[in-house]
């Protein structure tokens, strides 16, 4: 993998992470708005519900990022094995044609 590809992938990953972080913040603000209407903002249950909601949102984000990275790794492994098979096929064709 070239240096440029690695840099582009890392910048792309960071950008996606920022988008996901913004989505989590937006969901948290909506959730807090509705919770503040039902619960007092400084009550124990409000804090517990807020902490659990944050943990669930970050858990979903983590699982999604792991899934995306595994799919990318599988795609790269398949591409590498296909290119190795192509190289073997070309070398066997070249060796067969040189014997004639």
Curated annotation (Swiss-Prot):
Membrane in keyword set: yes
Virion surface membrane side: 67-83
GO cellular component, one term: virion membrane
Transmembrane segments: 46-66
Region spans: Disordered: 75-100
Keyword annotations of the record: Glycoprotein, Host cytoplasm, Late protein, Membrane, Signal, Transmembrane, Transmembrane helix, Virion
Record's note on what induces expression: Expressed in the late phase of the viral replicative cycle.
Main location: virion
Glycosylation site residues: 79, 89, 96
Entry-linked InterPro entries: Poxvirus_A9 (IPR006920)
Intravirion side: 23-45
Residues making up the signal peptide according to the UniProt record: 1-22
Localization per record: Virion membrane; Host cytoplasm
Topological relation to the membrane, as annotated: Single-pass membrane protein
Function: Envelope protein. Required for an early step in virion morphogenesis.
Family membership: Belongs to the chordopoxvirinae A9 family.
Name by which UniProt lists this protein: Virion membrane protein OPG135
Organism this protein belongs to: Monkeypox virus
Lineage of the species this protein comes from: Viruses, Varidnaviria, Bamfordvirae, Nucleocytoviricota, Pokkesviricetes
């Amino acid at each position: 993998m070239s240096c440029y590809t690695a840099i582009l992938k890392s910048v792309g990953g960071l950008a996606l992470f920022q988008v996901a972080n913004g989505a989590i913040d937006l969901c948290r603000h909506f959730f807090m708005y509705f919770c503040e209407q039902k619960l007092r903002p400084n009550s124990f249950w409000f804090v517990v519900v807020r902490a659990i909601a944050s943990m669930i949102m970050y858990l979903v984000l983590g699982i999604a990022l792991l899934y995306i990275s595994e799919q990318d790794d599988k795609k790269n492994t398949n591409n590498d094995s296909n290119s190795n098979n192509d190289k073997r096929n070309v070398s066997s064709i070249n060796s067969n044609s040189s014997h004639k």
